[in-house]
């Protein structure tokens, strides 16, 4: 009889402990949900915008490729080079696609649209689209280059890209462009 009473008491204690844990967890969740997160997932439509831009670049449809850019857009490379303004970006990429790059393809693309609510450093608040893709470019001189590229796009309040930061290995491009 003592064994049965002991087992019943242990079971009751265990069940009561479980109920308390559940109550505390739900309190924590409700407090956490009311706090604005520093960053969160953004609308998947931004990934679709990015995917379409790569398709346009592959086709050489640079006018359609430029549709996503704001007039005040800035295009920056990790080397420190940059293009300022939609006109400068269009001029550079149209010339490059028409006269330097014979064909270009993007494979194994990864897209991550995020909404930055509280910047950690110098990045702007708002929607950022982070992307990674394997790029193969064939140049008009017959040489080819393949590398992984990481590109970050920032969208303004009307869903136009106002900042691009692209991380590339220029040494691979320069080598492929040499005769």
Question: Where do the PLM segments sit?
Answer:
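Sec-dependent signal peptide recognition
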Residues: 2-8
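C-terminal motif of bacterial Sec signal peptides marking the signal peptidase cleavage site
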Residues: 13-16
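Short, low-complexity N-terminal intrinsically disordered segments enriched in polar/charged residues
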Residues: 18-63, 67
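A solvent-exposed, acidic/Ser-Thr-rich amphipathic alpha-helical stretch
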Residues: 64-127
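A mature extracytoplasmic/lumenal domain signature
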Residues: 69, 79, 133-135, 151, ...
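Exposed beta-sheet edge and beta->alpha loop/turn motif
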Residues: 125-160
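Low-complexity, intrinsically disordered terminal/linker segments enriched in charged
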Residues: 162-179
């Amino acid at each position: 009889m003592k064994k049965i009473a002991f087992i019943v008491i242990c079971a009751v204690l265990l069940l009561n402990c479980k109920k308390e844990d559940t109550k505390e967890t739900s309190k924590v969740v409700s407090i956490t949900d009311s706090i604005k997160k520093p960053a969160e997932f953004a609308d998947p439509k931004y990934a679709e915008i990015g995917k379409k831009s790569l398709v346009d670049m592959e086709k050489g449809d640079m006018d359609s490729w430029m549709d996503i850019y704001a007039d005040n857009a800035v295009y920056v490379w990790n080397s420190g080079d940059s293009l300022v303004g939609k006109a400068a970006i269009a001029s550079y990429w149209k010339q490059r696609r028409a006269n330097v790059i014979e064909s270009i393809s993007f494979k194994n693309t990864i897209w991550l649209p995020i909404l930055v609510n509280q910047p950690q450093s110098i990045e702007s608040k708002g929607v950022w689209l982070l992307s990674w893709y394997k790029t193969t470019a064939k140049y008009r001189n017959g040489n080819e280059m393949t590398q992984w590229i990481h590109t970050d796009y920032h969208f303004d309040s009307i869903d136009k890209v106002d900042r691009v930061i692209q991380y590339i290995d220029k040494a691979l491009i320069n080598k492929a462009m040499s005769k």
